[in-house]
Amino acid sequence: MIEWKTFCTIFWQRFNQNKLTQAAGYLTYSTMLAIVPLIMVVFSIFSAFPVFNEVTGALKEFIFTNFAPSASDVVGQYIDEFVNNSKQMSAVGIISLIVVALMLINSIDRTLNSIWHDTSTRPIFTSFAIYWLILTLGPLLVGTSIAASAYVKTMFENASGFSFGLKLLSFVPFLSTWFIFTVIYMVVPNKKVSIKHSAAGALIAAVFFTLGKQAFAWYIVTFPSYQLIYGAMATLPIMLLWIQLSWTFVLLGAQLAAVLAEVRSEKMINLEQIEETK
């Protein structure tokens, strides 16, 4: 019990020291600036692979449902319009959009490394290569996951006696979120992060993210004060609030993984000191 209280105390101290609520606000601002360029790049990548044409709609639904609960239809229409407008841009404009998308990834990189108190920097070409891989391979991995889930779901629906399998598939969004957070916590920090600590932090973040999404959607539908106050503009503050909460959950999971590593490191040091005194 004492160790658990100590762990919670350390976690809360680190959460406040790193000013993660302010960091979530900064990432929210960066996300709002980069969301259209990022989505444009993602769907441009998908258009280059005809095999993903059938799952593009499913991917849109996945993105909008997770990042704009209760307003996904409206946000989807706006994003589609913005992306269509971006297709008329010149090469210089497209490059600038890609740069903005990469800047968001850079912001995430610096924020997560500050949680692990890592001040080292990667060479600029290495950083660019990593960011570009995240920007290109990330959507492809998500698309592959959605395509595989859709294929398996079709198999279960066409076969009798597989209702249990369909119920299991309902956990795919949660498991996908857990997997994505785990990979982020392992790959982005410059320090080596164990898969055990990454998975533990990612699990908590995924639980908060999933429950928070449902609670947020319920609140917006049950207490439609934003719609009454802002009218047609209600989508913007709703989306801002949810992105802020989402980043708070992500950073909370990252801080948990970092504290787990910190506590383990301190235990190892204490054990070594005990061994030396024997």
Curated annotation (Swiss-Prot):
The keyword Transmembrane helix applies. It is a multi-pass membrane protein. The chain crosses the membrane at residues 32-52, 88-108, 123-143, 168-188, 203-223, 232-252. Pfam families: Virul_fac_BrkB. One of its GO terms (cellular component) is plasma membrane. It comes from the Bacteria. Its main location: membrane. Keywords: Cell inner membrane, Cell membrane, Membrane, Transmembrane, Transmembrane helix. It is found in: Cell inner membrane. Belongs to the UPF0761 family. This is UPF0761 membrane protein NT05HA_1801. It comes from Aggregatibacter aphrophilus (strain NJ8700).
